[in-house]
Protein backbone atom coordinates (compact mmCIF):
# COMPACT_ATOMS: atom_id res chain seq x y z
CA UNK A 1 0.00 0.00 0.00
CA UNK A 2 2.97 2.27 0.56
CA UNK A 3 4.85 1.33 -2.60
CA UNK A 4 7.39 -0.75 -0.72
CA UNK A 5 7.22 -3.82 -2.95
CA UNK A 6 11.00 -4.18 -3.17
CA UNK A 7 11.25 -4.24 0.63
CA UNK A 8 8.40 -6.77 0.86
CA UNK A 9 10.21 -8.97 -1.68
CA UNK A 10 13.42 -8.82 0.37
CA UNK A 11 11.56 -9.71 3.57
CA UNK A 12 9.77 -12.64 1.93
CA UNK A 13 13.03 -14.00 0.46
CA UNK A 14 15.22 -13.61 3.51
CA UNK A 15 16.81 -16.95 4.56
CA UNK A 16 18.39 -16.16 7.94
CA UNK A 17 16.61 -16.26 11.30
CA UNK A 18 13.94 -14.95 11.81
CA UNK A 19 12.27 -15.36 8.41
CA UNK A 20 9.91 -17.41 6.28
CA UNK A 21 12.95 -18.67 4.36
CA UNK A 22 14.48 -19.91 7.59
CA UNK A 23 11.28 -21.85 8.30
CA UNK A 24 11.43 -23.42 4.83
CA UNK A 25 15.06 -24.39 5.43
CA UNK A 26 13.88 -26.06 8.66
CA UNK A 27 11.31 -28.11 6.71
CA UNK A 28 8.22 -26.01 7.44
CA UNK A 29 5.21 -26.44 5.19
CA UNK A 30 2.98 -24.11 7.24
CA UNK A 31 3.43 -20.89 9.20
CA UNK A 32 4.52 -21.39 12.79
CA UNK A 33 3.35 -19.70 15.97
CA UNK A 34 6.83 -18.41 16.79
CA UNK A 35 9.90 -17.71 14.67
CA UNK A 36 11.98 -20.18 16.70
CA UNK A 37 9.58 -23.07 16.00
CA UNK A 38 8.41 -23.51 19.58
CA UNK A 39 4.73 -24.24 20.23
CA UNK A 40 2.37 -24.76 17.29
CA UNK A 41 3.83 -25.44 13.86
CA UNK A 42 0.55 -24.80 12.09
CA UNK A 43 -0.57 -21.36 13.14
CA UNK A 44 -1.79 -18.25 11.28
CA UNK A 45 0.25 -15.88 13.47
CA UNK A 46 2.49 -14.55 10.67
CA UNK A 47 0.25 -15.55 7.75
CA UNK A 48 -1.06 -12.04 7.10
CA UNK A 49 2.09 -10.99 5.31
CA UNK A 50 1.59 -13.81 2.80
CA UNK A 51 -1.31 -11.85 1.30
CA UNK A 52 1.33 -9.61 -0.28
CA UNK A 53 1.76 -12.22 -3.03
CA UNK A 54 -1.77 -11.97 -4.40
CA UNK A 55 -2.96 -8.55 -3.15
CA UNK A 56 0.12 -6.51 -4.10
CA UNK A 57 2.50 -8.49 -6.30
CA UNK A 58 -0.22 -10.07 -8.49
CA UNK A 59 -2.57 -7.18 -7.69
CA UNK A 60 -6.06 -8.73 -7.45
CA UNK A 61 -8.42 -7.26 -4.83
CA UNK A 62 -12.12 -6.91 -4.17
CA UNK A 63 -13.14 -3.25 -4.14
CA UNK A 64 -13.68 -2.40 -0.44
CA UNK A 65 -16.59 -0.14 -1.40
CA UNK A 66 -18.33 -2.99 -3.25
CA UNK A 67 -17.58 -6.15 -1.24
CA UNK A 68 -18.00 -9.64 -2.58
CA UNK A 69 -16.07 -9.06 -5.82
CA UNK A 70 -18.92 -7.24 -7.59
CA UNK A 71 -16.21 -4.75 -8.55
CA UNK A 72 -12.60 -5.94 -8.73
CA UNK A 73 -9.44 -3.83 -8.60
CA UNK A 74 -6.42 -5.10 -10.55
CA UNK A 75 -3.33 -3.10 -9.54
CA UNK A 76 -0.15 -5.17 -9.64
CA UNK A 77 3.01 -3.87 -8.01
CA UNK A 78 5.86 -5.59 -9.88
CA UNK A 79 9.31 -5.77 -8.32
CA UNK A 80 12.62 -5.84 -10.17
CA UNK A 81 13.54 -9.42 -9.18
CA UNK A 82 10.31 -11.08 -10.41
CA UNK A 83 9.40 -11.37 -14.10
CA UNK A 84 5.84 -12.64 -13.75
CA UNK A 85 2.94 -13.30 -11.40
CA UNK A 86 -0.30 -15.19 -11.87
CA UNK A 87 -3.26 -15.48 -9.51
CA UNK A 88 -6.88 -16.60 -9.75
CA UNK A 89 -9.66 -16.73 -7.18
CA UNK A 90 -13.22 -17.98 -7.11
CA UNK A 91 -15.79 -15.25 -6.56
CA UNK A 92 -19.57 -15.58 -6.11
CA UNK A 93 -19.81 -14.67 -9.83
CA UNK A 94 -17.09 -16.91 -11.26
CA UNK A 95 -13.33 -16.87 -11.54
CA UNK A 96 -11.34 -13.63 -11.46
CA UNK A 97 -7.72 -13.78 -12.54
CA UNK A 98 -4.64 -11.76 -13.35
CA UNK A 99 -1.52 -12.90 -15.20
CA UNK A 100 1.30 -10.45 -15.84
CA UNK A 101 4.83 -10.71 -17.17
CA UNK A 102 7.68 -8.43 -18.11
CA UNK A 103 10.13 -9.40 -20.83
CA UNK A 104 12.45 -7.36 -22.98
CA UNK A 105 11.03 -3.98 -21.99
CA UNK A 106 7.44 -5.12 -22.51
CA UNK A 107 4.87 -5.48 -19.73
CA UNK A 108 1.82 -7.63 -20.51
CA UNK A 109 -1.14 -8.12 -18.19
CA UNK A 110 -4.20 -10.27 -18.84
CA UNK A 111 -7.20 -9.96 -16.53
CA UNK A 112 -10.40 -11.97 -16.39
CA UNK A 113 -13.54 -10.36 -14.94
CA UNK A 114 -16.51 -12.64 -14.12
CA UNK A 115 -19.92 -12.19 -15.76
CA UNK A 116 -21.97 -9.44 -14.13
CA UNK A 117 -18.93 -7.75 -12.58
CA UNK A 118 -16.85 -4.70 -13.40
CA UNK A 119 -13.22 -3.93 -12.69
CA UNK A 120 -10.72 -1.15 -12.40
CA UNK A 121 -7.53 -2.16 -14.20
CA UNK A 122 -4.39 -0.23 -13.30
CA UNK A 123 -1.56 -0.88 -15.76
CA UNK A 124 1.86 -0.12 -14.19
CA UNK A 125 4.73 1.78 -15.80
CA UNK A 126 2.49 3.14 -18.52
CA UNK A 127 3.88 6.73 -18.33
CA UNK A 128 1.27 7.78 -20.92
CA UNK A 129 -1.98 6.28 -22.22
CA UNK A 130 -0.51 5.99 -25.71
CA UNK A 131 1.98 3.42 -24.38
CA UNK A 132 -0.79 0.93 -23.56
CA UNK A 133 -2.32 -1.40 -26.12
CA UNK A 134 -5.52 -3.22 -25.16
CA UNK A 135 -7.14 -6.35 -26.51
CA UNK A 136 -9.89 -8.58 -25.24
CA UNK A 137 -13.34 -10.01 -25.50
CA UNK A 138 -15.12 -6.77 -24.66
CA UNK A 139 -13.05 -4.27 -26.63
CA UNK A 140 -15.27 -4.28 -29.71
CA UNK A 141 -18.32 -3.57 -27.58
CA UNK A 142 -16.77 -0.47 -26.02
CA UNK A 143 -16.35 -2.16 -22.64
CA UNK A 144 -12.97 -0.53 -21.94
CA UNK A 145 -13.04 3.04 -20.60
CA UNK A 146 -9.81 4.96 -20.02
CA UNK A 147 -9.96 6.89 -16.72
CA UNK A 148 -6.60 8.68 -16.85
CA UNK A 149 -3.10 8.38 -15.44
CA UNK A 150 -2.68 7.89 -11.70
CA UNK A 151 0.81 7.49 -10.20
CA UNK A 152 2.42 6.00 -13.34
CA UNK A 153 -0.54 3.66 -13.78
CA UNK A 154 -2.90 3.91 -16.73
CA UNK A 155 -6.34 3.28 -15.22
CA UNK A 156 -9.24 1.66 -17.06
CA UNK A 157 -12.73 0.50 -16.15
CA UNK A 158 -13.84 -2.72 -17.84
CA UNK A 159 -16.92 -4.92 -17.84
CA UNK A 160 -16.91 -8.69 -17.61
CA UNK A 161 -14.60 -10.44 -20.06
CA UNK A 162 -10.95 -11.20 -20.64
CA UNK A 163 -8.58 -8.35 -21.51
CA UNK A 164 -4.89 -8.04 -22.29
CA UNK A 165 -2.99 -4.80 -21.70
CA UNK A 166 0.51 -4.36 -23.12
CA UNK A 167 3.02 -1.60 -22.39
CA UNK A 168 5.92 -1.35 -24.83
Predicted regions, residues:
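Non-catalytic C-terminal accessory modules of carbohydrate-active enzymes
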Residues: 1, 6-168
Amino acid sequence: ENGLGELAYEAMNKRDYPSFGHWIDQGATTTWEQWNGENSRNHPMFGGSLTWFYRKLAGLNADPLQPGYRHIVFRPQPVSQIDWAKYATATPYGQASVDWSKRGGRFTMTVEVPVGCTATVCVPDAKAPSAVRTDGTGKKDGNIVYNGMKDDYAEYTVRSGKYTFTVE
